[in-house]
Amino acid sequence: MSLNTPTQAVTKETQIVPTETLQQALEREHRAIDGGIESYISGLAKGDNQPAPLITAVEGLRRHIYLEEAFLFPPLRETSMIAPIFVMLREHGELWKAMDAASVLLGKRADESADSETMLAACWDLLSKLDSHNSKEEPIIYPQADAALTASASAELAAFLEAGRMPDGWICAAAQ
């Protein structure tokens, strides 16, 4: 992951290009989330403590985990994807905890009680976990979004990708 790659802001809604597959839309969200974290890391390394890129990326990642657990994984569990889905759910819990840790440190950065090196380490940890997770999820799980989901499940996932919002207070089960 390069800090020099262009970043795309993560929004609460992802516009799906009409010819875009579900796999492509899900991967695009991954790139935007990674880009937000990378942008924050780059700024922090230069002495800029603007939290917006990290806050947006964490909000986007939480929403992304929700959409996978609510819309993508349930129908895939009914196929032969039980073991890979189990791994993804476990890793979602690890990612959620890493986001919580980074968010706590971000609050401490606001009052300057957390140093930049600690914050950078937390962000790199989150990015490393994301890289490991995405390297499995993208080639194994995401192709099934287009191949194995029913038309109604695909439509529901596409609609959420375009305009869905995570319920307030939702936490992935593996983080509880």
Regions found by a protein language model. Give the residues of each.
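Small-residue-biased structural context
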Residues: M1-Q176
